[in-house]
């Protein structure tokens, strides 16, 4: 079908052709147009105008403050949207990076009250002020820097309070020591010879299971002793040698005189009772004196450590921990002289006072030591990525060439706390002299080989003399992480509350403390009078 319109528009002629599918031709004067082309052109421009209208409306809603009345301006504004990016997309990050990279001092933030305190405050202020990229970056930097400063201060305060809590003697323990010392002076039953005269030969009899506990904490020692004897299948074969210092000897003797653990044999001795320690110069005492002098000069005290604003909080925590009295305690170094302290014994199990024994330990004597001296649990393998990820590089400073050329940073570390020592094999080595040689080297280097603890020199001294034992015998970390599973801890032979959260402190983890507290007798008159809680 064709449609013809006369030039004068007086008549229209319809000619039947090939139907509607043919082109419709319009004649106006001498011109001829395709009606289909006109139709599709109008349709295209209709959609284009609608699209432009929608984009310009969205731009207005987004809050673009710049007016745009010309088509050229509108084109500039719509071009980035059509292309899917802004024209200055490369400049915005660049401007932000420049602002963020500029250092911001603490003084610039001091006394400022206009810095947003929360993310919600920050977003509200940015929307209200309609900030550009630089202003946005500046406000963001100020807020994050302020939060970092506050977080750092809070962390350091936490570490300082934990240091004070873990290093100080709780008044309950002080009370217990005083009451027992008084009891020792007025009550003959608190001054018994330990052990009784007829049991003294068993102290050097290698047919018995000999355990050594060095502690100046009466409450902790009582829990270790009670848990050891209660869980032993043959308690009559147990001999526990308790070593303490001069000031704690009388209270410790009073406690175990009034709280016997028969049929086990308990010996309580002070360091000054050992002839070996009272004759001539003792390396451990000399090393401790030097160590104390160097630490006092090197550290400067907790106030100096905390006042350092440039130090990482984790480093601050490590330095505070190094100030702990236990690292300069003779009780902590005494294990290196076990062969001299017990010259008649061939094998002993050395126990720390922050452990709890949950099973019979006599099978430890059946472990084949393969000629090695120290039976210990390794601490580089296990599900706990914090406690069981320790290698030599975790304790020793391998940036020091002396350490780097002598040891392998990837070598697996092991733990103190519950160790089987073959004293007969030990006496054939130079372990003790090696220990003191490296202690002296560390002091000469201003503690640059390692910074705290007796384990680092122990790792060096016992290097090549360690027999790995099953992790079942010694579970660590109960004083470090609250995430430790109670069920896992309950199934271990020995649980070790190494770390600051000792079970006798208020900062102990509540769900783990019952493992230790169940060996306290809440009805005991000394425990009750000093308000020592079992839970």
From Swiss-Prot:
Annotated GO biological process: cell wall organization; glucuronoxylan biosynthetic process; glucuronoxylan metabolic process; pectin biosynthetic process; xylan biosynthetic process
Predominant location: Golgi
TM stretches of this protein: 38-58
Pathway of action: Glycan metabolism; pectin biosynthesis
GO-annotated cellular components: Golgi apparatus; Golgi membrane
Highest taxon, organism lineage: Eukaryota
Alphabetized GO MF terms: polygalacturonate 4-alpha-galacturonosyltransferase activity
Compartment(s): Golgi apparatus membrane
Tissue distribution: Highly expressed in stems. Detected in roots, inflorescences, siliques, and leaves. Expressed in cells undergoing secondary wall thickening, including interfascicular fibers and primary and secondary xylem.
Parts of the chain on the Cytoplasmic side: 1-37
Keyword Glycoprotein recorded: yes
Protein topology in the membrane: Single-pass type II membrane protein
UniProt key word Transmembrane helix: yes
Regions of this protein lying in the Lumenal compartment: 59-535
Disruption phenotype: Severe dwarfing and seedling lethality. Collapsed xylem vessels. Reduced glucuronoxylan and homogalacturonan content in cell wall.
Glycosylation sites: 397, 430
Family assignment from sequence similarity: Belongs to the glycosyltransferase 8 family.
Protein task: Involved in pectin assembly and/or distribution, and in the synthesis of secondary wall glucuronoxylan. Probably involved in the synthesis of the glycosyl sequence at the glucuronoxylan reducing end. May be involved in synthesis of a complex glycan primer for xylan synthesis.
Protein known as: Probable galacturonosyltransferase 12
Organism: Arabidopsis thaliana (Mouse-ear cress)
